Amino acid sequence: MSDMNGQSADPATSGVRAASGIAATGVATSGIARFAKLAREYWWLLHGQLHQLRLQWFWYVVMMSFVPLVTMAFLWFFTGRSPEALLFIITGSITTALCTSAMLTLGQNIGYMKEPGSFEYYASFPISKPVFILALATRSVILSIPSSVILLLIGAFIFGVPMRPSPVTILIFILAGYSLAGLGAFVGFLSRDGQTAGLVTQIIDPLIIFLAPVYIPGEHLPRFLQYTSRFIPTTYVANALRASVAGSVTSQTWLEIGLLVVWTVLTLWAASRKLAWRANE
């Protein structure tokens, strides 16, 4: 049957359409509600992590700035003052600071959280593992901001290297932090305790810095390292940062950004798989 406008007036058909519409609305509503719940979990977890740093943040910044600054000064005296060399030194130092804060510090922090049973405390709350790891990673990324800004300003105003950072630089910095934080989280959850996590992260840190084209061009590395460095995230972090602050973002840079996205997803997923709220899990 049809009404005066030519539309179907069959009650069964109308009922099916109404039910479909209600179901679709319900799915959309439940999806929004779940997203809002995850966002609240993330905010409160991040707020708690940052609250713990209220008395320690200064020394974290000093620690994360000291080694990159010393390395920058040493290489400045050793390699000369050419703009290309200085650009490698500055972006390499920022990459080192990111490794220290995002990978090394987070890995050790997670390892030491195992000892007093901190994860059992978090297990008492209705929170998801990926959100918990994302909050820990965000804390590490935030901690790396002051030291990276300091290094960038020193490069621009003391070394006189022309810097043209853009919104792409911010995107690369965030992805770099999360990709290295994912690696640190995986090591931390994989380690038996804080001491083991500390030893492993301190071994990994120089390897992913000095066996990749972080401070020197890739073609200056031994041929073997030119191949193996393709599987190290700092290769893409340093290359992308260098291109963005120099204002020379190309299709290769976007490819490296895409690889950082893949590395971030894989490492954070692997870390969430290794997270056990309780020792017997």
PLM features per residue range, with description:
Residues 2-167, 171-179, 183-209, 213-236, ...:
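Hydrophobic transmembrane alpha-helices and immediately adjacent juxtamembrane helices
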